Amino acid sequence: MVYRIKVAGVERDLPLCPINEELNIGAFVLFGDVELTCKCAEELYKMAPEHDVMITSESKGIPLIFEMARQMGVSKYIVARKMQKLYMSDIFSCDVNSITTAKKQTLYLDGKDAEFMRAATSTVSILLLLARLVMDT
């Protein structure tokens, strides 16, 4: 079973994945899909409010945030990691729940990234924008 979707002018058939007995979701995967990634980034760039910082979790949002930063001429974006890394210091963490992950996850930011965010006047979450783009299409 598949669910046909049209996002940013690009059509794809998404395989349906069961979440529980009553709910299936279409697996929207950007990894490896250059056309879809570039088109979504272009549309999200148009939708994004004015911001100083872009952030995503260590997820399928990484190629998207990279492409958005490239198109916008931005030299930095932040990725909240799923595991602490040896190079991180003064780590900031928060617990999150995801529809595609059965249990609670913890995301981690290096202290320098957390400071960069604190200094910003506005931040945009790429994954929230992507959800809005998909729902509006």
Give the ranges of each region predicted by the language model.
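Cationic, amphipathic, low-complexity alpha-helical segments enriched
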Residues: T121-T137
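Short Gly/Thr/Asp-enriched flexible loops that form oxyanion-binding sites at enzyme active sites
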Residues: L64-G73
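Active-site-facing substrate-recognition patch
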Residues: M1-H51
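Short glycine-rich phosphate-binding loop at a beta-alpha junction
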Residues: H51-E58
